[in-house]
C-alpha cells in the first residue's frame, strides 16, 4: 500500500511539473512531503493534500487577466517552487511522522490545522484580487493595490473562511471528525490566515522599484535591483507562511491537549 501511495506522489509531482504548476524543486519537494504524509496518514492524508494543492492551482487560473498586476507585486508568482511547498507542507510532514510513531489523534489535528491555515491563506490570495475594489492595508489603514501583503478585502476574507472550511469539511468525511473538531480546524485555519495578513503588514520585507516606484516583494523589478524600504530583511513570504501557520497550528495543538 505504501509503495502505491509513493507512486501516486511521484505521478502527482510529475503532473504538476508537466503542467507548470510546480518547478523542478517544487516537484521534488512535493514528492518528499507527499511520501511522508502517506507514511503517516495513508491515502486519506494524500487526499487532503491533493484537495489543497488542486484547489489552489485551479483558483490560480481564475481571473488571470485581473491578477497580472498582482504578479508584479508578490515575491513569487506562477509555478510553486520547493521553498513554497516546504513552507506550506513542511510542518504537515512533521505531523505525519509524529502520528506514525505515536498514533496520537492530536497529531492528525495538527496536520489538518497546518493544511487548513495554508489553504485559507492561499484561497484568500487567489480570490481577493478578483474584487473590483482595492483592499485595505492594515499598516496604513488606506486602500492598497491588490496583492499587497497585509491588505484585506471582503471577498478575500470570505475566501479565507471558505478555504479553511473546505479542508475541515473534507476532513470530516475522510477522517470522521466530530463537529467540534471541524469547527476547531476551521477556526485555526482562519486564525492562521489572519495572522499571515498581520505579519505581512508589520514584518514582511518590502522593496521599491527604482524604475517605476512601485512597492513590491521582489528583489528585482523591470530588470533592475529594487531598493529595500521596510520590514524584517529575512522575513519574506515563505518565512511568513511558515511562522504564522506554525504559530496558529501550535496554539491549536495546545487547545487540543487541554480541551
List the predicted regions and their residue ranges.
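Hydrophobic alpha-helical transmembrane segments
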Residues: 1-259
Amino acid at each position: 500500500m505504501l509503495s502505491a501511495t509513493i507512486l501516486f506522489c511521484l505521478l502527482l509531482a510529475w503532473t504538476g511539473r508537466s503542467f507548470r504548476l510546480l518547478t523542478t524543486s517544487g516537484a521534488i519537494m512535493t514528492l518528499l512531503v507527499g511520501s511522508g504524509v502517506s507514511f503517516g496518514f495513508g491515502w486519506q492524508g494524500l487526499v487532503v493534500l491533493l484537495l489543497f494543492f488542486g484547489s489552489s492551482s485551479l483558483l490560480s487560473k481564475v481571473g488571470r487577466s485581473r491578477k497580472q498586476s498582482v504578479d508584479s507585486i508578490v515575491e513569487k508568482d506562477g509555478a510553486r517552487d520547493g521553498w513554497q511547498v516546504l513552507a506550506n507542507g513542511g510542518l504537515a510532514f512533521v505531523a505525519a511522522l509524529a502520528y506514525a510513531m505515536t498514533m496520537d489523534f492530536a497529531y492528525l489535528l495538527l496536520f489538518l490545522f497546518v493544511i487548513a491555515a495554508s489553504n485559507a491563506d492561499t484561497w484568500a490570495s487567489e480570490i481577493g484580487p478578483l474584487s473590483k475594489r482595492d483592499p485595505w492595508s492594515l499598516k496604513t489603514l488606506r486602500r492598497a493595490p491588490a496583492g499587497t501583503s497585509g491588505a484585506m478585502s471582503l471577498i478575500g476574507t470570505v475566501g479565507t473562511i471558505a478555504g479553511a472550511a473546505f479542508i475541515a469539511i473534507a476532513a470530516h468525511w475522510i477522517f470522521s471528525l466530530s463537529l467540534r473538531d471541524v469547527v476547531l480546524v476551521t477556526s485555526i485555519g482562519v486564525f492562521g490566515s489572519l495572522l499571515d495578513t498581520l505579519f505581512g503588514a508589520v514584518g514582511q520585507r518590502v522593496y521599491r522599484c527604482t524604475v517605476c516606484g512601485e512597492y513590491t516583494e521582489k528583489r528585482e523589478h523591470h530588470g533592475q535591483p529594487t531598493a529595500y524600504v521596510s520590514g524584517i530583511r529575512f522575513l519574506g513570504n515563505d518565512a511568513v507562511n511558515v511562522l504564522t501557520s506554525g504559530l496558529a497550528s501550535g496554539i491549536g495543538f495546545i487547545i487540543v491537549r487541554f480541551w
